[in-house]
Amino acid sequence: MVLIRVLANLLIIQLSYAQKSSELVIGGDECNINEHRSLVVLFNSSGALCGGTLINQEYVLAAAHCDMPNMQILLGVHSASVLNDDEQARDPEEKYFCLSSNNDTKWDKDIMLIRLNRPVNNSVHIAPLSLPSSPPSVGSVCRIMGWGKTIPTQETHPDVPHCANIKLFHYSLCRAVYVGMPAQSRILCAGILQGGIGSCQGDSGGPLICNGQFQGIVSATSKPCAHSLMPALYIKVFDYTDWIKSIIAGNTTVTCPP
């Protein structure tokens, strides 16, 4: 418990001085304490900050660009200033990536699977979120959450995670506004067209939940965050389920989807 408190104090510092390269929820409200049991915090003492999603007792899914040296993982956190009795801390034992040197596929390879150094115990504030059983539908209302910035122009982060509802759009909309995106991709396009609500610095790696299913990983946003007509980009989890399941089953040399 002493270690948890030390790490929690570090997290408070990170939320105050988080790097500008992370992502945060703009235009959202404080999450209910019971709706983010799978949300984890990835951070280190140098100021890096990201979210992630617990998918079973031993594995966390996040964005590849959230990889950082000396990574610490906190689970069961609601308030950075008030310790939950069931908060748990873990270190990464192994990290798995889908790296690509192909410009047409590097956009959608921003995914990292982390094996924890020891299993997590389910509790009141900690529970995994299962992988999706089917892909999401365009038009779905989806939920985002994280400790990212709540004001795009300020480097302040909330004490508790913020949540917001956004809409899933056709991929072609994001391709039209983000230069260099390929014709086909394993990326989801989601946001609010009028702007003002969306992921931002500090939210990277966190979940996109559509109709109760874990469908996306926060990957990239407009600059500034939640800009009108510029939805954010999310890695499509469904397309990687076979890769993820193979690694969990012990096949760590499995090939990523093309």
Curated annotation (Swiss-Prot):
SUPFAM superfamilies for the chain: Trypsin-like serine proteases
PROSITE patterns from the UniProt entry: TRYPSIN_DOM, TRYPSIN_SER
Species name: Trimeresurus stejnegeri (Chinese green tree viper)
Quaternary context: Monomer.
GO cellular component terms, A-Z: extracellular region; secretory granule
GO biological process: proteolysis
Principal location listed in the UniProt entry: secreted
Propeptide intervals in chain numbering: 19-24
Cellular localization per UniProt: Secreted
GO molecular function per UniProt: serine-type endopeptidase activity; toxin activity
Name of this protein: Snake venom serine protease CL2
